[in-house]
Amino acid sequence: MKNQKIFHLVTVSKSIPLMRGQIEFLRKKNMDVHIVSSDGKELKQYDNEIAHVIPMKRDIALFSDLKSLLKMILLFHKEKPFIVNSGTPKAGLIGTIAAFITQRPIRIYTVRGLRLETVKGFKYFVLYLMEKIAMFCATDIIAISESLKHKIITSNLAKENKITVLGFGSSNGIQFEKFQLDNNKLEEKYHKLLNDNFVIGYVGRIVKDKGIHELIQSFKIIVSKGYNVKLLVIGSLETENSIDESDYLFLTQNPNVVLIKHVSDPISFYNNMNVFVFPTHREGFGNVSIEAQALEVPVITTNVTGAIDTVVNGETGFIVEKGDFKAIAEKIEKLINDESLRETIGHNGRKRVENKFSSQIIWEELESMYNTFLKESEGK
């Protein structure tokens, strides 16, 4: 098995943490796993023997994309991987096409979400075509949630028999043992800012598609009712799909908002939240939702692809209609006024995450999938 190479692809090195622990787990199982991405510090953490740099741009750039495709074809021709597992949209497209052209036996497209869900017109057509080509070139598809699998099928992107969901879903699961409830100490400056208020939390990219406008509007409703609350937002403000200026000013200037651009370890921040609001418009799965639940924080999310897989409505959190900030505010108020409900939902969420979304489950299922392919190749 050692001589059969397995290539994992992502577009940019910043996406390598999506596979945190997975590469190491598979290599310990004597699998010759390599990583391909654009250059970056995350890729440099791996030995040159298994780390391959192929420059790729996240946005559509025809000339640059063709150059990336050619370099990928040359890499596959030289290294001859038996399995190519391509994740993230651009690497998914370039990787599956290159693997198809070079006739790599197993071509997996790991779908972590569909950007086309929140766009219209010509851009929708382009993104749909990209997904259609990638899924056609793939021999197998991994969807990171059951609802994402359903969306792929109903969008006529691929047939059901081509799609697998590992375990109960998620991008990579979570390493549950790291999510300790007693890890709640914040730097003094953050502790003073939160000041023992009821904390409404959010972790993720600060873009329209994540429902930031609804997060802000629901928070305004709660404040208008006289509750002593703080909004803790952890994430980076991005230029693509950027939020409205009024929302930007609210996040950066309102004294009841604590905005933190980036933290390497959000666990202590989760442990200082009373409720986690995840009003996303689309997801592949939504790992931040299960991270919050792992630390007994009730989650309020929306009824969209990916997010609905993370919460059992009324048991580990609440699911509301996409865009309905009044419903979000209603659920927040319910949780503010019922400490017993918060505790019950929190306990239920942690138990469910431990039982269903451990990284070990995802890794073992992926290992089993690879072993099946490798054993089939030995019999030929």
From Swiss-Prot:
One of its GO terms (molecular function) is glycosyltransferase activity. Its EC number is 2.4.-.-. Pfam families: Glyco_trans_4_2 (PF13477), Glycos_transf_1 (PF00534). It is an enzyme of class 2 (transferase). Keywords: Capsule biogenesis/degradation, Exopolysaccharide synthesis, Glycosyltransferase, Transferase. InterPro entries: Glyco_trans_1 (IPR001296), Glyco_trans_4-like_N (IPR028098). Coiled coil: none annotated. GO terms for biological process: capsule polysaccharide biosynthetic process. Pathway: Capsule biogenesis; capsule polysaccharide biosynthesis. Signal peptide: none annotated. The keyword rRNA-binding does not apply. Required for the biosynthesis of type 1 capsular polysaccharide. Belongs to the glycosyltransferase group 1 family. Glycosyltransferase 4 subfamily. This is Capsular polysaccharide biosynthesis glycosyltransferase CapM.
